[in-house]
Amino acid sequence: MLKGLRKKASILSLGSMASQQSTSSAINSESNYDKILTQVYDFEIALKAMDYLLDDRTKTGTDLLQNEASKNNNSEQPHAIFPLALGVMEFIEATLGFEPEVMAKAHKTLSEAENASLNNSKYNLKYQLATSMIYPPGTEFQVTFAESTLLNALLMLLTENNGMVESAKALFKLRRAYQTLDAVYKKIKESEPIFNKNLAKLKKEAAMQGNGTKSNSIITTENFSISTVDLPGYSSQTSSTSSLPQDISLMKNLEKIYLMRKSRIEGATLANNVNPERVNLFEDSNSSLTLAKQSNPKYEEQRVDNANNNNNSHDVGEDDSSSSDNEYCDASEEFDIEDTLNLPPPQIHSSAQSVLSSIETSPSSAQNASDNHLHVSTIDEYIHSGVQLCFGILQVVLSLIPPAIGKVLSIVGFRGDREVGLRLLWRTAITCRNVHGELALLFILVFYDGPVQFVDNGFRLPDQGNDKKIISLDNKATVSEAELDIILERPELYTSQLLRRARRMFPHNALWILQEGRMLAAEGDLALATKTMQDFTDDPANEIQMQQAEALLVFDRATIYIYQHEYDNAARDLIYLIDINSWSKAVYLFMAASCYLEKYRMIKMDIISVDNKESEMAKYSSLFDKYLDLALSYVPGHGHNAVGKKGGIGGSNKQMPFDKFLLRKSRHIEARKKKYPNLPTADIVGTSLIHELIYFWNGYNRMSSHDLEIALKLLGYSGAPNSEYSANTNGNLYALIEETEDEAMIRYFLQGITLRQLGSINDGLGLLDNHVISKYVISEPLHQFRFHKMTYSPYIYPTALYEKTMFVWLLRTKNTAKLDVHQAVQESKSWLKRAEIVGEGDYELSNRTGMRIKAAGDRLEQLATL
C-alpha cells in the first residue's frame, strides 16, 4: 500500500514537474493546439454539469457528463475531469445524507477519478501539453488528483465500519492531498507578481486595439472580442484577417470555449431569471475589449468572413492551427472570477434584504471584474479556485480537531490553521463563479450558521463593528487582506450577500433555501425561517430532486419548530424523515417522541389551551409511548427493526453518539418504571428531553425572548417543589415523581443558559455554580483543580465548565468603561482549561463537546491579539 502511494506521489510531484519547462510559450507546438482546446472544453463541460447539481438538476448534469464521455470512448486522449466532476456531485449527495449506498458509489467514482488524473498527468507530460500560461504541463491534473483524493479520504473517514487498514489508507490519502495542495498553493503565491504584470499587459493590448494597433492576445470577430488566453503559445497577430481553414477552425473553437465560459459566469447556461440574449458580461460598455472594438476603424476589415466560418465550422479538437508563440504567464493569489449579472433583485423576503438595503458602500468596478474574467483562462480558474477551496477546507477541518488528536496529526505533517483556511474560503466564495466558489459558500454557511457550533460568536467585544461600513461584495473581482480582516470580524454581515447571489443563480435547489432558513434562525427570526422553508416544500412547482437536500431541510425545519415550541409540526417533519433518509431513524423517532412529551406538558401546565384537556393529554401520552418504543427498535445492535440494516454514518452497524444518548435515557426511564409501576411513561420522565436535545443544535442561541420564557417554564415542570425556578409548589404539583440530584443538575444547567440568553447573567451563573459545578468540582483553583468523576450524564460535566467560560466573559466585558480585554481573556481561558481537563477521554457526545471547547479557545486566542 505504501509503495503504491509513493509511486503516485512521484508521478505528481510538483518539484519534478517544475524541472520541465515552466512557460507554455516554449512548449506548445501547433500540433498540440487541438489537444489543448479539447481539454479546456472538457473542463467547461464539467463545470457546467456541476452547476446543474447546484441548481438541483443532478440528472441533467450527469447525463451531460456521460454523453460527453461517450463521444470520447475511442480517443487516446484521457478525460480525467469527467469522473472527478461526477465524483464531486456524488460526494455532495453522500455527505448531505450519509447514506451507505450513496457513499459507496461516490467512493468508487472518486477512486476512478484518482487513477484518471494520474493518467492524464502523464499524458500531458508526455506530449508537453501546456494548458496554462504559467504552470508546468499536468498541473491541472495535480489539482484534480488532490481534489479527488481529498474527497475520497473524507468519505473513507466518515465510514464508521472501516477497519484499521481502511482508516490508515484514508489518512495517507489525506496527507497526500495536503502535500499536493500545499505545493500548488505555494506556486500560486509565488506567481502572483507575474500574473498581475501580465494581466495588466493583456488589458493594455486590448485597449491598444482602439488605436488601430493589432494585438497578439485578442481576436476580434463579427460578434465578440476573444482572448487567446485559453491557448498558451498562440498568437493572434495575423489570425483575425486570415482566411486559412485551420485558422478559422481554431478561432471558431476558441470562440466556442469563450462563449461557454461567458455563459457559465453569467448564469445564462442554467436559464434562471436571465435572458442570455440580453446579458453580455464581456460586452459591458466599459470593458476594455468593447471599447477597443467600438473605436477601432479597422474592425470591419478584421472580421472573419461569414462564408469562411460557415464552410469551415468544426468542433473543438478537430483541426490543428498554426501561430507564433507568446511569452505570457498567468497566475494569481486570488482567482478573479465574480458574478456580474445584471439581474433583477431576488424574490427573497428575508432579513438579508433589509440588511443590504441599509449598507452604504462605494460601487465595485464591473469593468475590472469583466476584464479579469476575460483574461483568465478556464484552466487557471480551475487551478486557483480548486486549490483555494480544497486547501481552505483542509485547514479549517484540521483546526477543528481536538487538541489531543491534533498534536498527533501534526507530527505526521497535518497542521491546520483556521484563519488561513477561512481566508481562502471567503476569497473563493467572493471571487469565483464556478462550483468551487459555491461549495466554499456552502462550507462558510455551515461553519457560521449551521446547527453545530463550529465558531463561538458569543465571545465578542461590546459595540463591535459598524454596519454602515459594510463592504459590498457585488461584482468584486478581488478582495484584499484588509477587507478579509473586516469580513472575518463580522461574517454574518456578508454571508447574506453571497447567499442572495446563490439564490438568484440557483433558485431550484433546496440547499439554498435550507441555508437561508438557517441564517434567519441564527438572526433570531424563527417564524420567517420556518415560513421560508415550509413555503418552498409546500409549493407544488418546487420538485426537490436531491432527496438528501430535502432531508436536511426538513430536519432543520423541525429543529426550528422545536425552538418555537410548535411540537406537532416538528414531530410531523421528524416522522417524515424516516421515509426519505436512513441517517438515524432512531434519533428522528426519539426526537418526535420527545416533542409529543413536551406537548403533553404544555397542556398539563395550561401553557396552551385545548377544548378537552384530559383527552388531549391522553392523546399525547400515547403518542410519546408509541414513538419512544419505535425509536428504540431502530437503534443499531439493539432493536428488532435494526437487524440486518445499516445505520449510522456510512452505514455501519455501530451506534452513533445520539443512539447511546437515547439508550441511556431509556435505561433511566426503565429504572423509574420499577419505582413507579402505576404511572404512565409520560409521567416518569425527568428533565425535558427535547430541551436537552436542542442544546446540541444550538437552540438556546436562536430562541426569541418569548420562546425562552416558555422554555424556562417547561424546564421547571420536573423541578422539586419550591426549589429555584421549579414550576411545582407543595400545593400545585405537575411532576408526579421525585427530582433526583442528577436530573436537577441537567435542569439547572439548561435553565442557567436560558436565563443568560434572557439577559439575567448573574442569575444564570448562580444556578450553574450552586446546582451544577459545585456538585462535582472539589477544588476550583486551576493549579490544584480537582473534581469527582460522575457518569450519569457524561457530557454535562465538561460542558457546564465551558458555559461558565461564557458567563465569565460576558460579566467581564459588559462594563465598557472598565474593560480589560486581556484580563477577560485570561480568566475565560482558565475556565476553558478546566473544561478541557474534565472533558478528556472518549465519552457520549465527546466530539461535539470537544468542538465547542476548541471553537471557544480559538476565538479567545483571536481576541487576545486585538
Swiss-Prot record:
Which compartments is it annotated to reside in? Answer: Cytoplasm; Nucleus
Annotated Gene Ontology cellular components are: cytoplasm; nucleus
* InterPro entries recorded: Iml2/TPR_39
A Pfam family the protein falls into: Iml2-TPR_39
Which keywords, in A-to-Z order, does the entry hold?
Cytoplasm, Nucleus, Phosphoprotein
Q: Where is this region: Disordered?
A: 292-328
Q: Where is the composition biased (Acidic residues)?
A: 317-328
Q: Tell me, in one coarse class, where this protein mainly resides.
A: cytoplasm
The family line of this record is: Belongs to the IML2 family.
Its job: Inclusion body (IB) resident protein that interacts strongly with lipid droplet (LD) proteins. Involved in LD-mediated IB clearing after protein folding stress, probably by enabling access to the IBs of an LD-stored soluble sterol derivative that acts as a chaperone in inclusion clearing.
Kindly give the PANTHER family that the UniProt entry links to this protein.
TETRATRICOPEPTIDE REPEAT PROTEIN 39 FAMILY MEMBER (PTHR31859), TETRATRICOPEPTIDE REPEAT PROTEIN 39C (PTHR31859:SF1)
On subunit structure and binding partners, the annotation says: Interacts with lipid droplet proteins.
Q: What is the name of this protein?
A: Inclusion body clearance protein IML2
Q: To which species is this protein native?
A: Candida albicans (strain SC5314 / ATCC MYA-2876)
